[in-house]
């Protein structure tokens, strides 16, 4: 069978239909769930309620409220300097992966038998939280940062609803991605939010642009792109995402029979074609590019499989 190359279009500005974060935030409901959010509420000239998305403490508090309200995770805290992820956009990746898996397993794409590997889980542990609470999947989260693994582990331990659903594992060799992690294991999915930037300077410039946009009042669902924190490994690597994902693709060959679908977010559209070309050369049977909309921003992930089913 020839390799399949799918590019799914999305309705402009709309999150996945199953994403509970579609539409405006219900800040009143979130404040009832997390009363501390009240101190960060501001009133716009229109009379609508909002928060200051350039205020790291306000964004962190909003995340705690969202996780408690929608995912029953009431104990979530990350130290200053680590990524404070945009919950709605992160949830979209999970829901579109669920669609991808359901194409292969229409009657059994939920539950603890589904095993997902999250590369670069980070201290926030956000993908395992959303995936396990939304679909009951079992996650293995990895990171090269021992402190990130420790903090994520504390989050899992502090929330009984996550116990037994999330396993955390440090990647001891910073030069490797799958090797030393998958070993003899098997997974239905792998996922990754890779370091997008090629240098620290590029990462800092990106954050400055986000701050500038907020300063000009561009407040919409795209404001959730804010990631003003971040350790070096979370934000950049030599060569940027294309180098990282080429290595990921090449390493995936060794685990072709152990993983149903490999996947990763892909921030730069220009990187799609060279990655698809490489994946074809590596023998992938199925390659898909799935677009996701968050406000005015279109993001995407690339997924590949060495099986034809």
Swiss-Prot record:
GO biological process terms on file: rRNA base methylation
Catalytic activity annotation: adenosine(1618) in 23S rRNA + S-adenosyl-L-methionine = N(6)-methyladenosine(1618) in 23S rRNA + S-adenosyl-L-homocysteine + H(+)
Stretches the record annotates as Disordered: 1-21
Keywords, in A-Z order: Cytoplasm, Methyltransferase, rRNA processing, S-adenosyl-L-methionine, Transferase
Database matches in InterPro entries: METTL16/RlmF (IPR010286), rRNA_lsu_MeTfrase_F (IPR016909), SAM-dependent_MTases_sf (IPR029063)
Compartments where found: Cytoplasm
Enzyme nomenclature, EC number: 2.1.1.181
SUPFAM superfamilies: S-adenosyl-L-methionine-dependent methyltransferases
Entry superkingdom: Bacteria
Gene Ontology MF term list: 23S rRNA (adenine(1618)-N(6))-methyltransferase activity
Membrane spanning residue stretches: none
GO annotation, cellular component aspect: cytoplasm
Family note: Belongs to the methyltransferase superfamily. METTL16/RlmF family.
Function comment: Specifically methylates the adenine in position 1618 of 23S rRNA.
Name by which UniProt lists this protein: Ribosomal RNA large subunit methyltransferase F
Taxonomic classification: Bacteria, Pseudomonadati, Thermodesulfobacteriota, Desulfobulbia, Desulfobulbales
């Amino acid at each position: 069978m020839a390799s399949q190359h799918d590019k799914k279009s999305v309705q402009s500005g709309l999150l996945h239909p199953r994403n509970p974060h579609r539409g405006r935030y219900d800040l009143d409901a979130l404040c009832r769930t997390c009363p501390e959010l009240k101190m960060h509420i501001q009133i716009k000239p229109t009379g609508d309620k909002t928060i200051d998305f350039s205020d790291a403490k306000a964004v962190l508090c909003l995340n705690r409220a969202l996780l408690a309200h929608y995912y029953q995770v009431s104990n979530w805290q990350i130290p200053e300097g680590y990524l404070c992820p945009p919950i709605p956009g992160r949830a979209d990746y999970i829901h579109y992966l669920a669609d991808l898996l359901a194409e292969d397993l229409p009657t059994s794409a939920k539950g603890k038998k589904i095993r997902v590997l999250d590369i670069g889980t980070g201290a926030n542990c956000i993908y395992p939280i959303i995936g396990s609470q939304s679909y009951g999947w079992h996650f293995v989260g990895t990171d090269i940062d021992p402190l990130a693994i420790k903090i994520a582990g504390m989050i899992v331990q502090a929330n009984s609803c996550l116990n037994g659903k999330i396993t955390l594992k440090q990647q001891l060799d910073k030069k490797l991605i799958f090797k030393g992690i998958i070993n003899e294991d098997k997974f239905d999915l792998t996922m990754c939010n890779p370091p997008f930037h090629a240098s620290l300077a590029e990462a800092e410039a990106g954050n400055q642009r986000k701050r500038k946009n907020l300063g000009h009042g561009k407040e919409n669902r795209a404001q959730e792109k804010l990631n003003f924190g971040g350790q070096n490994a979370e934000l950049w690597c030599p060569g940027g995402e294309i180098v990282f994902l080429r290595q990921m693709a090449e390493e995936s060959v060794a685990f072709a029979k152990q993983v149903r679908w490999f996947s990763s977010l892909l921030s730069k559209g220009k990187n799609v074609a060279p990655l698809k070309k490489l994946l074809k050369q590596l023998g992938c049977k199925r390659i898909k590019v799935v677009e996701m909309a968050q406000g005015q921003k279109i993001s995407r992930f690339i997924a590949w499989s060495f099986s034809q089913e």
